Swiss-Prot record:
Keywords: Repeat
Protein's recorded name: Chorion class A protein M2774
Region (Right arm): 82-100
Family: Belongs to the chorion protein family.
Domain of life: Eukaryota
Protein task: This protein is one of many from the eggshell of the silk moth.
Chain spans, region Left arm: 1-33
Transcription among keywords: no
Region annotation Central domain: where it falls in the sequence: 34-81
Transmembrane segments: none
Amino acid sequence: GGGWNGWNGLGGGWNGLGVGWSRLDGGYGGGCGSYGGEGIGNVGVADELPVGGVTAVGGRVPIIGGVEYGGPARAAGAVSICGHCAPTCGCGRAGLGGYY
């Protein structure tokens, strides 16, 4: 697929170009306001983004602009996005609750 490094080969996601994760909505970027969705400014990581445990997002993460990584993004535990096009939470626009 055309996703982020062909993530699971399921779609264009992450940049809003395809159906993305499990084809629930616009994908890991295409729908639900997208991963570059709502707000102001950019999120830039110039080096490393280490996650040693679990990063949980229980509400909304509004971002507008670019999400850019200049180095590796490493997750030693689990990185879960619940409510943003995840099969267990879904997307508001897909009628599954979640992000909206």
